[in-house]
C-alpha cells in the first residue's frame, strides 16, 4: 500500500468519525434544547408559586395590622 493510499484510508476513517460526531452533536443539541424548555417551564411554575405565597403573606400582614 502506498503512502497516498494510506493517507486516503486515514482520511476516510476521519471523515466517518467526523460524520458520527456531527450526528451525536446534533442529537445532544436537541436533547439540551428540550431540557432547557422543561427548565424554563419549571422556573415559571416556581416563580408563580413563590409570588403567590409572597402576595398571600403581604395580604395577611396588611389584614393583621389593619384588621
Swiss-Prot record:
Keywords: Cell membrane, Coiled coil, Membrane, Transmembrane, Transmembrane helix. It is a single-pass membrane protein. The chain crosses the membrane at residues 44-66. GO terms for cellular component: plasma membrane. Residues 1-40 form a coiled coil. It is found in: Cell membrane. This is SPbeta prophage-derived uncharacterized protein YopZ. It comes from Bacillus subtilis (strain 168).
